[in-house]
A protein has these predicted regions:
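NTP-binding/hydrolysis catalytic cores, primarily Walker-type P-loop NTPases
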Residues: 58-62, 344-365
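Phosphate/oxyanion-binding loops and surfaces in catalytic or ligand/nucleic-acid-binding neighborhoods
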Residues: 14, 37, 48-51, 55, ...
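P-loop NTPase motor core
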Residues: 23, 28-29, 33, 39, ...
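Short, well-ordered coil/turn elements that cap or connect secondary structure elements
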Residues: 13-15, 202-204, 272, 304-306
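TOPRIM fold recognition
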Residues: 1-72
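C-terminal anion-handling pockets and recognition modules
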Residues: 339
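Cytosolic-facing regulatory segments adjacent to core modules
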Residues: 134-233, 297, 350-352
């Protein structure tokens, strides 16, 4: 028994497959079993050899299932099914061209320094996606639902008045929500607000905002996404605002370990349900000056490697010695979008936007 135990430990340490069987029955060893009944011992050993061979063959069959050849049919089926799940345009035409049509299944991470407009950019894209008839599921960790709604309606007032050069009628988010100000508005200003609300209501049915009250982490994002698919039968574009304030995956993990687990889980959600997941990320303090780079993303290791698309926003001229604080005071601001990584397309593409901070609006230049 002791010898068998030592052999077992030795085989385990060498990672050699084995199984245990006692062919001796109640006899103390093989010699005693042979003397007692040669025929029975021989049959027992032959059966053990047969069983070992069967187990080995089964192990081989299981391993060979990993051969890529076994997945060709599934691969072809995925191509066929993609006809019913085409890419989803963001509504920013130049960005869609750079992304080969729009959003596909995968993990998209977009980052920028504080207060540069990353949430506004993504929520404008979300509105444009919803306008086209697609569902959008937004996990908002900081902003309340009412804040996001006010920003969208403010943007609608700007878009309604821009063609005729009447943007003086457009209203900021605060101008929308501050009821006392309505006493001072002209009737035509109020009509713009009411029309903007109607415009927003027409596509708001496709937008689902989950506020970050309580513990919202990767597990809750998966559960909510799966519930949405189960109830509506539609795969949404999932947006997380933002990564670094999601609930920790494990309280005992370091910040980096938690970020690694969260990013990997978001990647799995996109893969398991064949949908785009967009995560907004903050930058580390060391990256507040100079051009945007992959290593700028806070706790960036897994973000950099696991994301399918990595996008950075920066003030135009960030490669030069500019005063970021002064640039942030401008309205509109010239903002550059840089595609830092694209697993299935071109990288290094830079797109220029005009960001109207008053009315939460990005336009491509």
């Amino acid at each position: 028994e002791a010898a068998a135990g030592k052999l077992t430990e030795g085989l385990k340490s060498l990672n050699i497959a084995f199984y245990k069987r006692n062919p001796y029955g109640d006899h103390k060893d093989a010699n005693e079993a042979l003397i007692a009944d040669r025929q029975a011992l021989t049959a027992e050993i032959q059966e053990a050899e047969q069983e070992a061979g069967d187990l080995r063959r089964e192990e081989r069959r299981e391993y060979l299932k990993n051969s890529t050849a076994n997945y060709i049919a599934a691969f072809i089926n995925d191509i066929d099914s993609s006809v019913n799940t085409p890419c989803i345009p963001t509504g920013f035409n130049k960005l869609d061209i750079a992304l080969d049509g729009g959003l596909y299944e995968g993990l998209y991470v977009i980052g920028a320094i504080s207060s540069l407009g990353k949430t506004t950019f993504i929520t404008q894209a979300a509105d444009q996606i919803a306008k086209a008839g697609n569902d959008v599921l937004i996990f908002s960790m900081e902003m309340a639902r009412s804040e996001l709604m006010a920003k969208s309606i403010s943007r609608e007032t700007y878009q309604l008045t821009l063609p005729k050069g009447e943007t003086w009628k457009a209203k900021t988010a605060r101008g929308i929500t501050a009821g006392k100000r309505y006493q001072e508005y002209r009737q035509e200003e109020k009509e713009v607000i009411y029309k903007a609300i109607r415009e927003y209501a027409a596509y708001a049915k496709n937008i689902f905002i989950i506020e970050g009250a309580g513990e919202v982490g990767a597990k809750q994002i998966r559960e909510t996404t799966e519930k949405h698919i189960s109830i509506t039968g539609r795969r949404p574009v999932v947006i997380i605002d933002y990564l670094q304030i999601l609930s920790p995956y494990n309280e005992r993990y370091t910040d980096k370990q938690n970020m690694d687990k969260v990013v990997l889980e978001l990647k799995r959600i996109s893969r398991d349900h064949k949908l785009p997941v967009i995560a907004i990320s903050s930058f580390n303090r060391m990256s507040y000056k100079g051009e945007v780079k992959e290593e700028a993303f806070k706790e960036s290791g897994t973000i950099e490697y696991s994301s399918d698309i990595l996008i950075g926003l920066q003030v135009k001229g960030a490669d030069k010695d500019i005063n970021i604080t002064e640039e942030k005071k401008k309205n509109p601001r010239d903002i550059e979008l840089v595609i830092l990584k694209n697993r299935n397309g071109a990288t290094g593409i830079t797109l220029l936007y005009s960001y109207n901070t008053l009315f939460n609006h990005f336009s491509e230049i």
